Amino acid sequence: MKKDSRVYLAQILERIDRILEYTANGEKAFFADSRTQDAVIRNFEVIGEAAKRIPDEYRKNHPSIPWRELSGFRDILIHQYEGVSLSQIWRIVEKDLNPLREAITKVIPALDELERQISGDEEPDGG
């Protein structure tokens, strides 16, 4: 049975929140703690994997989310780990994570609508 897309979107939001929590003490603390770095990288990997599992139709209808970039960053982290710059990761945390969280939160209601259309239900209450 395929997981519901809401599960993947919830995973993305949960992992974003974890990264924000782990990095709340700022840049200096991030660069000083390899455990925090590893935790942040792992959560980015999970975000990318969850993004890959969102159906194409949903991704096409929500181009405001950088689906390809999320998946691609995951691949870089997994396959080219040595080449990953902690400065690049920090830049993403600092500049991209909150806007991504906001964008994901905004598109979740559209998933409910798409699933209603696919199932043939006209209204959320079934009437």
Where are these regions (language model features)?
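Solvent-exposed interaction patches of small proteins and small membrane subunits
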Residues: M1-G127
